């Protein structure tokens, strides 16, 4: 009989720490519902004391999902734990995730403390959280660089204090796979009472070993893994949920199963990528667009003769539909709703109406609208909610002449117009926009991505600007790349307005 591995998803907490990937509460609920359908056991919904937005998101996610455990992160601080419990009040299944740094680097430089005092604080935090909930997870931050003997003392102490799960993070992504295996194995063999708690992995990808370390941790006895969709996360990211799930599905002989419905992996990946404006690299394992593509003649010949010559997974096992429906201007609202549902997105009727209006405009500009376009439309911010909107844009450009742009903006229902010339159409359009906004934001990053294939593609522009020492991120999408660029800049302006 197979052993059960619990999947703890931290896309909405650790994953959302990526610059430019912040979600609003409605989007977080959308992701949480998709994670529930995917079959994750635990959803880390946020760090409630960090901001009112995180606090509110944990509350609303707790209301929106039914069977997964909803987890809230805290430091080993009583006030953090108080606030976390308040945020979890509507959760059907609650978990508080508290902890403290245990490496000598953290003890000395972060806390200016001693090993003995850290254990005292760890025990106190665990006992305090236990007053609120039965399910308490304790994290030993930077466990990867904590010596095993001291780490075992901390783990034993918090289990005695009531921890039901103990998280052993490779916070800096420093561990080698064998080293991480040995660490988990050491704890399994040297901690008194280890059977009263589940050991959890939480590995970062700074050296590209997050999945290998997580897998080795499972082989050594960990029975919870902390992962994110697409491996997103701080710095180089976290262990990918899809990689661990499919490793275990492909290697059934290991005798370890998860509750993941793998056919939901690809739709969930696409939805998260779209909402967070973070493209999945083409060669990403499991969910990259090239993951099941074959360009070598030898490989193509083999696959045509028998798919198992070069494919160890059926694309349908991860939810890739080779017979994806292409929508046109004649497609109805029901067809759009169906394609969104297939891709893991279920919208309320009012939002669906607005997305359908955008779809019709796009369908008039393109011959065909595919799934990537549909997800882009669903993930785009609703313009009606923004203080600044693009009314019109006209650009004149050509070889050997300066580009000229005229732009019209609607700002809080007041109309403004301006014109400017520049070195190219995008430069001219942004200069005209700046004449109206009168805020000299500095462009720090500008990237263009094709959403799909073809000369009538939707182009997606990601932009980062700096104003008064703060960074703001925006994106725009349109079949016209100049319009997409202006929309991205306007998105940055609206993000600035929202935060101020």
PLM ranges: what are they?
Residues 4-5, 11, 246, 253-419, ...:
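A mid-to-C-terminal "edge-of-domain" accessory segment
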Residues 5-7, 17-42, 55-64, 78-199, ...:
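Alpha/beta enzyme core
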Residues 14, 18-19, 47-52, 103-105, ...:
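Short, small-residue-enriched loops and turns at beta-alpha junctions
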Residues 17, 22, 30-31, 368-472, ...:
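Non-catalytic terminal/interface segments that mediate subunit docking, oligomerization
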Residues 67, 169-171, 226-234, 249-258, ...:
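Short beta-alpha connecting loops at secondary-structure transitions
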Residues 67-74:
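A glycine-rich helix N-cap at a beta->alpha junction
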Residues 175, 182-305:
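Catalytic alpha/beta core domains of metabolic enzymes, predominantly
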């Amino acid at each position: 009989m197979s052993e059960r591995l619990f999947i703890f998803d931290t896309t909405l907490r650790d994953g959302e720490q990526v610059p430019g990937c912040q979600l609003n509460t409605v989007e977080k609920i959308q992701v949480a519902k998709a994670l529930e359908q995917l079959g994750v056991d635990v959803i880390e919904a946020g760090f409630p004391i960090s901001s009112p937005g995180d606090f509110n998101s944990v509350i609303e996610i707790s209301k929106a999902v039914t069977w997964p455990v909803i987890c809230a992160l805290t430091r080993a601080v009583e006030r953090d734990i108080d606030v976390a419990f308040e945020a979890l009040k509507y959760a059907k299944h609650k978990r508080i995730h508290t902890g403290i740094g245990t490496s000598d680097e953290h003890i000395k430089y972060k806390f200016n403390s001693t090993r003995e005092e850290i254990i005292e604080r760890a025990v106190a935090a665990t006992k305090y959280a236990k007053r609120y909930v039965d399910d308490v997870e304790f994290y030993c931050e930077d466990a990867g660089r904590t010596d095993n003997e001291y780490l075992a003392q901390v783990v034993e102490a918090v289990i005695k204090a009531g921890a039901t799960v103990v998280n052993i993070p490779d916070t800096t992504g420093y561990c080698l796979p064998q080293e991480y295996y040995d660490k988990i194995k050491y704890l399994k063999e040297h901690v008194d009472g280890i059977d009263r708690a589940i050991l959890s992995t939480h590995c970062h990808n700074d050296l590209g070993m997050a999945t290998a370390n997580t897998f080795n941790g499972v082989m050594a006895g960990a029975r919870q893994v902390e992962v994110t969709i697409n491996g997103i996360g701080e710095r180089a990211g976290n262990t990918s949920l899809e990689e661990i799930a499919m490793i275990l599905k492909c290697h059934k002989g290991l005798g370890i199963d998860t509750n993941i419905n793998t056919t939901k992996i690809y739709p969930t990946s696409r939805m998260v990528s779209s909402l967070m404006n973070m493209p999945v690299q083409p060669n990403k394992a499991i969910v990259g667009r090239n993951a099941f593509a074959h360009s070598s003649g030898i490989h193509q010949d083999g696959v045509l003769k028998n798919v198992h010559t070069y494919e160890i997974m059926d694309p349908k096992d991860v939810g890739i539909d080779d017979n994806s429906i292409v929508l046109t201007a004649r497609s109805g609202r029901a067809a759009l709703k169906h394609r969104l549902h297939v891709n893991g997105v279920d919208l309320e009727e009012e939002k669906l109406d607005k997305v359908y209006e955008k779809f019709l405009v796009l369908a008039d500009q393109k011959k065909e609208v595919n799934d990537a376009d549909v997800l882009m439309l669903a993930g785009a911010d609703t313009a009606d909610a923004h203080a600044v909107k693009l009314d019109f844009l006209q650009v004149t450009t050509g070889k050997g002449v300066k580009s000229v742009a005229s732009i019209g903006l609607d700002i809080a229902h007041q109309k403004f117009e301006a014109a400017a010339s520049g070195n190219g159409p995008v430069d001219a359009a942004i200069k005209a926009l700046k004449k109206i906004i009168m805020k000299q934001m500095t462009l720090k990053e500008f990237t263009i991505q094709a959403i799909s294939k073809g000369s009538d593609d939707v182009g997606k522009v990601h932009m980062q600007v700096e104003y008064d020492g703060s960074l703001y991120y925006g994106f725009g999408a349109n079949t016209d790349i100049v319009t997409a660029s202006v929309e991205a800049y306007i998105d940055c302006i609206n993000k600035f307005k929202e935060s101020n």
